[in-house]
Amino acid sequence: MSAATVILILLMLLGILGRSNVIAAAAAFLLLLQFTSLQRFYPILERRALEAGLIFLVVSVLVPFASGRVAPRDMLQSFVSLPGLIAIASGIIATHMNCQGLELLQRFPQMMIGMVIGSIIGVAFFGGIPVGPLMAGGIAALLVHLMAWLR
């Protein structure tokens, strides 16, 4: 059994233990590709899977607008109310942090294991909800930049 297979099995098990279905499913999918000798698709997935995933994420967020469940008046409230302005600022900060997290994970993919373990600890002992590696990566990137700045 290759080291890559062991790592994917470990990630899948950690995802299951940490109740992170996304990590468990992604690791299982890659294991399936590996066991069926379809690794030739890895470069395509590496280039395009994140983009495809983000499209599905944005589609799921836009469905309430497309279905008419969010009225134009409600949308305008987000531009003139304090909670709405805070939500806009939070979205800007979160997306910037997610971008930093993605860049960090692309440079240091080995950090994923630590983030998954941290998610498991957060769920098991602090009542957390595993939301995915980008936000954890964003926070890690912020802390890495802070440590570099403090040196």
Curated annotation (Swiss-Prot):
Q: Which organism is it from?
A: Moorella thermoacetica (strain ATCC 39073 / JCM 9320)
Q: Is Acetylation set as a keyword in this record?
A: no
Identification of the protein by name:
UPF0756 membrane protein Moth_0120
Q: How does it sit in the membrane?
A: Multi-pass membrane protein
Signal peptide extent: none
Annotated family: Belongs to the UPF0756 family.
Keywords in UniProt for this one?
Cell membrane, Membrane, Transmembrane, Transmembrane helix
Cellular compartment(s): Cell membrane
